[in-house]
Amino acid sequence: MAFLIHSPLEQFEVTSLISLNLPVLGYINLSLTNLGLYTILTVYLVLALHIMGSNNKQLIPSRWSIALESSFASVHGLVKSQIGAANEMYLPFIYSLFFFILIANLSGNVPYGFTVATSIMVSIGLSMTIFIGVTILGLRLHKVHFFSFFVPSGTPLGLVPLLVPIELISYLARAFSLGVRLFANVTAGHVLMKILAGFLAPLFTSTFIISVLTVLPFIIFTGIIGLEIAVSFIQAYVFCVLTCSYLKDAIDLH
């Protein structure tokens, strides 16, 4: 029995779906890739789910409306505990960020789908944008005093030249660590599912006895799919927790 195993990394390849060449400003090539398509679909799904869950004209809320309100309450509690009640102006941003990452991760679990977070450019782009925004916020609030963040309180004067570069490197690493964490966790799960599915599919099309014996590994595989769905929620939540932590550092210089 021959096994045809494709690379588990093929699912992360960014391919052009529609390409358009325009003779504007010399030569312009416009193309819609699978990454761009699923990013647009993610934004559309986030908006559509909230519009459908709107409960403005109903006295009794629907189950979907209750689920959205519960999600909002959870994110609100996160922002309140991490940043403080006085800084709830950042709640819309954190809430939008949570649902964008969540829907992007969940849509990638659909067969033949594409996970936006498995693009290192998107993940690093998100973390870089947050890092730059948080840094600008800290400079706007504290001016020159913002640089005291790189000198831990109570540090002896003799250790300042040693600790400042360490703190600076640690701070700059945030621009990448946030995105790399999301990228690595989501990518690892999809690679594992691709490898297991590549082995199980030929076994099911084999002899009757082998097909029956494959039921148990398939049940385990189904459990891994459920675990990957849970990871979609966890990674969205962890990303928002760390973003709130960075916002708190910029606001309070802790």
Curated annotation (Swiss-Prot):
Keywords: ATP synthesis, CF(0), Hydrogen ion transport, Ion transport, Membrane, Mitochondrion, Mitochondrion inner membrane, Transmembrane, Transmembrane helix, Transport. Residues 1-6 form a propeptide. Signal peptide: none annotated. Gene3D superfamilies: ATP synthase, F0 complex, subunit A. Its main location: mitochondrion. GO terms for biological process: proton motive force-driven ATP synthesis. GO terms for molecular function: proton transmembrane transporter activity. It is a multi-pass membrane protein. The keyword Nucleotide-binding does not apply. It is found in: Mitochondrion inner membrane. Mitochondrial membrane ATP synthase (F(1)F(0) ATP synthase or Complex V) produces ATP from ADP in the presence of a proton gradient across the membrane which is generated by electron transport complexes of the respiratory chain. F-type ATPases consist of two structural domains, F(1) - containing the extramembraneous catalytic core and F(0) - containing the membrane proton channel, linked together by a central stalk and a peripheral stalk. During catalysis, ATP synthesis in the catalytic domain of F(1) is coupled via a rotary mechanism of the central stalk subunits to proton translocation. HAMAP family: ATP_synth_a_bact (MF_01393). This is ATP synthase subunit a.
